Structures are given as C-alpha cells and as structure tokens.
Amino acid sequence: MPDAIRQLTLANGLQLTLRHAPRLKRSAAALRVHAGSHDAPAKWPGLAHFLEHLFFLGTPRFPLEDGLMRYVQALGGQVNASTRERATDFFFEVPPNALGGGLERLCQMLAEPDLGIERQRREREVIHAEFIAWSRNPTAQQQFALLQSVSARHPLGAFHAGNRYTLALHDAAFQQALAGFHQRFYQGGQICLSLCGPQPLDELERLARQQAELFAAGERVPQILPPPLPAMASALTFTHQSLPSGAEHALELLIAYLEDSRPGTWLGALRERGWLRRFTAERLYAFAGQLLWHLDLKLSADACPDEASALLQGWFRFIRQADREQLNHQFGLLQHSRAHSASALELARRDSTGQPFAKLDTQGLQALGALLESLPGADHGDWQLLPVDPLLKADLPHAKAQPLPAALKISDQLPPARQFAALYLRWHVPSPMRQPLQRVLEQALAPLQERCDRASVQLQYSSAGEYWQLHCAGLPAAVLRAVEQALALMLKPPASCWLPCTALPPALIPIRALLKQLPDAVRGSLPPAVPACTLTQQQLDSLWLHTEWHGMAAGFEDTALKALGAALEQCPGQGSRPSPLPTWANHRWQHAQVPGSEHALLLFCPLPAAKEAAGRLLAQLLQGPVYQRLRVDLQLGYAVFSAFRQVEGVGGLLFGVQSPHTDQAQVLDHLLNLLRHGVTLDPAARQALAGQFDEPAMANADVAEWAWQTHLATQADRLDVLRRSILTTRQTDLDHLLSALLDPGSAWLCLANAAAPDTSWQGENR
C-alpha cells in the first residue's frame, strides 16, 4: 500500500509535508531552511555554517545536556545538520513516541537560539578544527579545486566553511550580520518541515502545528540569483543554465541509468575493455535553473580517456533518443524499491527537499528533455536499453526446494512480516593465499555490488584476520537472487578478475581509516607473507577445499527458506560452527599506518558477553560526559564519539577521537580521567536504553546485525533477555564493571596512528 501524504501551509508561512508509512519502525523530522552559505554576507565566510553549529549548544529552555543531540542520542537515534550553498538542513530520527520531544527541541533551538559570545568563542575553535581537517583532506581539496575552476565570478569558487580568522566574533558588524541572518531566514516563510513515521497523518499534523508555531510569521525571501555558470572544459564535469523546474529530479534519473554497469551501458562498455576501476556520479550544485555535476571516473593505466569520453557522448545521444516514457517507467520501479527500503530519516529528508522517491511527473519529463539536449552527443558505440534488473522483482526465484545446511543458523529475532531478510556467510580461510585471492573475489563481486546498490540491496564482502564474510540484506527475493549470483562469482570469478589491479581505494580521514582496520586489529592476526606469483583458478579451487564455513539467516519466511536452501547448494567449503572469540592479555597498542596528519585514536575495551547489558548502559551513561568534556570543554576536535560496539563477536566500549592539536597520549589521559570519574545510574536512561532493544523499535538491519554478532559470540540471541538484563542493572553493577575495566591487567586495545606512549602497552606495528 502506498504511503499516505499530506501537504499544507501553516499560518506563519511554513510549508509542511507529512508522510504516514505503517511499515516504518521509527519516525523522523527534516527541516530545510532556504538559506545557505551563498546567502550569507561575503564579508564573513562561514557565517551560515557557524550559526548551524551554534544552534546545537542548547538554550535556556533546553540546555546542552537536554538539547536535541543528547535527547536523540539517548534514544539510540540519529541527528545531524548540513549547510549547503543555498539551503541548511536539520534532521533527526527517533522512536515514534519521542518524535514530539525531538521536534519541540529542534524548533525551539532554531527559533530562539542562545548566541552568547562565550559559546561562540568555543564553537569557533571547533569550526577551525573542521577547517584544518578539511584543508588536509585530499578528496575535499580536489572537490574545492573543481569548484574554483567553474568561474571566478560565481560564489561556488569562494571559501564558505569558515575558520578562526573569517569569524570575527568581536566585530560588532559580524554580530549584527549573524543576528540579521537568523532573523531574515529562520522564519516560517523560509522553512519546509517534513515529518514521517507510522503515526496517522492527523497525529503528525498535530505535532507539527504545536511546535512549528514557534517560528515567526514571514514570507519567502527572494534569494539573490547567481551569475551564469560557464561551460566546463572537463569532459566529465557538466554545467547547465536556465533549466526548467524539475531538473534535479531529471538528473537523478540520468544518474540512475549512468550507474547501471550491465553490458550495453556506458560503464558496461568500459568494464568489457578492462578499463573501469571506480565510478561515482555526484550533483555538486543546483539552484535557480543551474546544475553542476561531476563524474569521478578512475580508469586503468592502459585505458584511453579520450575513447571513454567519446563512448560517454555516444551513450548520451542514445539516451536522448530513447523512449522517455519507458525510461521513466523503469526509473519508477527503481524509485519504488528505494522508497520501500528507505528509513524514516531518508524519506523525511527527501520530502523536505521536494525530491521524494518517485518517477518523473510531467514537469520532470520536460526538464529531462532540456537536460539531455544540453549534453554533448555523438554517434559512437553500441548501446541497449536494458530490461528491468531481476533484483527488482518481488517474486521469489523459481528453484527446487532444498534442505538448509546444518551450518546455517536460523534466527527468529526478525519476523518475516518485516519484509526484510538478512544472510551472513563466514568462511575460515587459513590459506596463505587468502589475501591475494581476496582481491580477485573483490573484483568479481564489484559489478554485482553496483547492481545491488542501485536496487537498495546491501551486499558486502569483507575480511578480518583469517576470515572472509559475505553479508546480504534487503527484500527477501532480492537477497536470494543476489546471494545465488554472488556465490557463483566467488566459485568461478570471470577471467578479467585475475589480472592485477593497481587501483587504490579513496583515501579516508584518519579516524575512519582506523575504524576500517578495527576488525583486523581485534582478530590480532597479521597477513602472511605471500611470494609473488600468478593467481589461478586452481589455487582458488584448492583454497575452497580447505575452507570451513558457517552462517546465519534472519527474516525469511518458510517458502523463502526453501529457496535459500537451493541457493546455498553451491556454497563453497565445509560446514562448521563459529570459531572461538579472539582474546588477548593486558593492554595492547597497535600502530596503524593510515593517511592523514591529524592525531587519531580508537580505544576498545572488551567486556565478557555476560556483561553486555551493563556494558551497554555504561556506554550510554558515558556518552554525554565524553562529548561534553572532549568536544565542548577541551575542544579536542570535531570527531569525538563513544559507544558500545560489537566487533567480530566481541562486545565492548569503543571511544574514538581525531584531533589536529592533541596527541594520542593526551587523548588517552582524558579518557582515563573520565572513566575514573565514574557514572551515576539514571533510571530514565536505563528505561530508554532497554526500549531500544524491543524488536518493533529496532531498525531491521540492526536486529539482524545484533543477532549475527551474538551468534559469533556463541550466545543465545534473545532480545527480551537483553532488555530484562538492562532493566535489572544496578549502580553496583556499573561500579564493578568500571573497576574491572580500569584494572591494569584488563584487556584493552588501542588502535592509533602513532606509537605506544610508554612500555605499559604491548606494541605492534601494522
């Protein structure tokens, strides 16, 4: 049944979109203010971004400890904001019964912010830390250089992020501009608010009316039109001028077809030639009929860039001549799949921007025509308009039912009625050839992963220590088809995948690079030395003969399980059971070589499986103090977090910090001081945490991941048991757990981009 949608305008001018989606477990709000960095005075670069930060520092009515961020985080929700060129977005997702509290805090902080000078001073340092990280990030600098190349007259080429020197806090003119920007743009006529959740439309409307009346009445302020966008010299960057309304949605359709890498498409042609290494398409700017978008294409060393560009122009011409109704029909099927798989937060954000998951309307089709006409074209290449991807089919694949392997556990924690299935397969690969052969499998699975991404199916192939893992999740029919194809590719990779691949993955900021290495670090195994050799299918066949596997499925109904049995007939390796969890003694420090110059550290403190409930509550109670002390008081940097995490089946406290000026040893001291300070049990926080582990309140993917991690830990996967354990956790339980964690002999893992600070840590370089 399609979602029920209601749109209306409130008395203060605020535009409201409400979406009732009964399948959702959570509710979300997304608020867009039609003003961004290009609308701020050019004299004060970063003013709009700075104001966005200040909103989150609390107000007299809702101080920081009870503000939107803490409120949402305490409920296990998501919250964030983003300042773009001509708009600023605020959004959060929470359990349905908490939507009103979140919306009240959001509207109050935006309508009546506290812009005190002392908090401005502190937050300016956070902005400056972001600026330093941005200036050191190669990817960010490449994009900035691209924007600067557009036009010297267009504001796209200017600096808008802000730093310590552009935000002149003690200049009266700056303070006047800051207050004036808020008064001019943060009023009803400038705001679009969307609410989305399982609640009836009338309830959503009541909540919206009750809180949105905080905004002053106003009319839409005409935003200054930018100068023209000149044509770009780059073959992969495109500018458009004077496009009709609906052009952003039309570009989404075009990119959806560009991302199709099956034979007969542009990416398919590049892949057939062995040239394609990596591809992403990104809309960089859209406003007042202007569009700027870019194709980030990485080709092999032997590729011909001119031929790749010529093929692209040939494909543009083909799409321009294709039946647009047929294009739109297939796009509609893709959008329907995306909408069904989207979270409440994704749906609300799309609604707030006027870009719901839907096919093009009449205006959008006209915009598509104008967009295609403004693209270069050539009579070059052999192209096809392909049929609908089978991954979008809702019916189960036809196959003779087969019994499920004994190595596959069936979890009952995710009801089939959710229409979300997850499958985890894990292989123990002791062979020294696992690392080079892993790269072969990564290349083999890449085209299928691209198709899965388009069809809103998760397909992830990963490794940790001596283990390979395949994870697939989404609509049950799509999961079955994707897994069957994935296993076939893992058994017999195409010939092109055996060639050496020299493409490097995109560089990550230090803290994200450490998070990527964390599973390997927990496993504690270094990759074996492998002599250079030519890889062959025979080596892979031999590897599979000496490999053991086990897995877990969740969310499949009986008929789908029978089809899953057929799909797993070709699962390589011998069935087994989960391996013992990794363990280590005392404090272990791992020095990771990652790109970037900022100090970064992850501290992982494992806990016994029986202490999961107390550990989760302890992590919840530490989250606020960690953020307050490290991010707000000490201003170590903008990347600060703490949480309970399960990694390779091992549950524990995880702390992460990236700082441009405070080294790892100092960060560690601050964390230890926080732990020594202890926590005080808050019954309300305990109740809220327990509520997060009620299946109807958990995201489907989170239920499946929790069940899998619990399976790896060889524990019983019962959410009701975890909830009861949380509710019965006492202050003494938390005190004893903290005392055990602080014992010098406790098993800690510190993963950092620096050497151990002293000999109390057992060091290791990677």
From Swiss-Prot:
Biological process terms in GO annotation: proteolysis; pyrroloquinoline quinone biosynthetic process
CC cofactor note: Binds 1 zinc ion per subunit.
Keywords: Hydrolase, Metal-binding, Metalloprotease, PQQ biosynthesis, Protease, Zinc
EC number(s) given by UniProt: 3.4.24.-
Coiled-coil region(s): none
Keyword Metal-binding: yes
Location of the active site: 52 (proton acceptor)
InterPro entries documented for this protein: Metalloenz_LuxS/M16 (IPR011249), Pept_M16_N (IPR011765), Pept_M16_Zn_BS (IPR001431), Peptidase_M16 (IPR050626), PQQ_synth_PqqF (IPR011844), PqqF-like_C_4 (IPR054734), PqqF_C_3 (IPR054733)
Needed co-factor(s): Zn(2+)
Family: Belongs to the peptidase M16 family.
Function field: Required for coenzyme pyrroloquinoline quinone (PQQ) biosynthesis. It is thought that this protein is a protease that cleaves peptides bond in a small peptide (gene pqqA), providing the glutamate and tyrosine residues which are necessary for the synthesis of PQQ.
Protein name: Coenzyme PQQ synthesis protein F
